[in-house]
Amino acid sequence: MKLKEILVILILFIIAIVFTVWYQNDKSVDGPRVCFGENCFSVEVADSDVERTTGLMNRESLDSDAGMLFIFDSEGNYPFWMKNTLIPLDMIWLNSEKEVVYVFKNAQPCTADPCSIITHDGSALYVIELNAGTA
């Protein structure tokens, strides 16, 4: 192989590496994000009965900047439990004005039957679940 051909292949290889690194670092989040001040989280949205019932069940892990946003049809008192949830979670209830009305920290996976219910006295339209220790 001639030196010129080797040089062209090397340059193309370097360009491919630079593009790949740039693309990986510059990927924008496709899904919705929820922010508390400067702390932002990519969230999966649970806005149907099936999605809200399933939630984060049977997940073995959750990225440190990820969570699940539960959206209800109307403001109300929505209890949660940790049935079949494998990771500890923080839960944040928000009203229709997106104001935090209650925080439950470090909800543990359910090992009892029946599982205990996590609730509060207020009214919420949204609940966000994040890794325990995040809220």
What are these regions (language model features)?
Residues 19-135:
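Compact, glycine-rich, soluble single-domain proteins
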Residues 1-12, 21-23:
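N-terminal Sec-pathway targeting helices
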Residues 15-16:
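Accessory terminal and edge-of-domain segments that mediate assembly/interaction
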